[in-house]
């Protein structure tokens, strides 16, 4: 159902979400394929369908604009803008730095007996954290993001990665702003 998407396009200042752009792109591709199939048939074939498709506009320029921004998974392409590509590269770099530093802290904590030998990095509230037994929670400097239901385990973001994680969050906010800018631009073009 495209009506809600088309209605949303009509609202000045609004923008389509990536998945809405993907749905519109899919519909435009389908329309182009159907019209192309019918019009490519030999003369005399499907006369009624040919008559129906004669006036159908398939908007190739809009389809190309959507394809430039939206990928086959319905997400905004990194290549949609140089800015987005740069931001996403920086995000990947920061994620790698955080993972490497967390792994170092975790290994040190394991060898010191502060955390269990089978402890693994996990995510709590969007932050990479280390699970630490309640008795050892003061032995790792950092920010406590969560505790287990039993209260026996605390999930700590080590101080060594707090700044890197803050930078990562800032990059994710930049990414979100750039994606919204691209989708707003694309929606205005569709309008």
What feature does the model see in each segment?
Residues 1-87:
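Conserved amphipathic alpha-helical "coupling/scaffold" segments
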